From Swiss-Prot:
GO BP: any one term: lipid A biosynthetic process
Sequence similarity: Belongs to the thioester dehydratase family. FabZ subfamily.
Gene name, Swiss-Prot/TrEMBL: fabZ
Protein name (Swiss-Prot/TrEMBL): 3-hydroxyacyl-[acyl-carrier-protein] dehydratase FabZ
GO cellular component terms attached to this protein's record: cytoplasm; membrane
Length: 145
């Protein structure tokens, strides 16, 4: 999926759209997406000016956005239909290494379970095949607005 396609499945826009491309997607099972980290992103003006580091919460948000695309594609819906996937839980988060401008985050998400409208995902973010962040995320569909 190109960035134009990604924008059809996420309501986020600059500066908070954190998925640049989807490389793989298996409906109801998994997604692999990319986030290209650039020095021009606004968080780097304050985190930290002398040694810019992508905040861990932004990495988790990028993973959460990947879960949203997977869920929307799996349910054949889009935000334009008046629905949104909301992050409702974060478990087992680990940060292994810093992410700096110039890095390319590979975001890998697998569905663990879907129970009573709650999706649970196993997620990891890597740079150059090294695990940066791992987590279990949960999201659910809500009416936007």
């Amino acid at each position: 999926m190109s960035i134009q396609d990604v924008k059809n499945y996420l309501p986020h826009r600059y500066p908070f759209l954190l998925i640049d491309r989807v490389l793989e997607l298996e409906i109801g099972k998994s997604i692999v997406a990319l986030k290209n980290v650039t020095f021009n992103e606004p968080q780097f003006t304050g985190h930290f000016p002398e040694q810019p580091i992508m905040p861990g919460v932004m990495i988790v948000e990028a993973l959460a956005q990947a879960t949203g695309i997977l869920a929307f594609k799996s349910e054949a819906g889009k935000p334009i239909d008046g629905q949104i996937y909301m992050l409702v839980g974060i478990d087992k988060v680990r940060f292994k290494r810093m992410v700096e401008p110039g890095d390319q985050l590979r975001l890998e998400v697998e569905v663990i379970t879907i129970k009573r409208g709650i999706w649970k995902f196993k997620c990891k973010a890597t740079v150059d095949n090294q695990i940066i962040t791992s987590a279990e995320l949960m999201c659910t569909q809500r009416t936007a607005g």
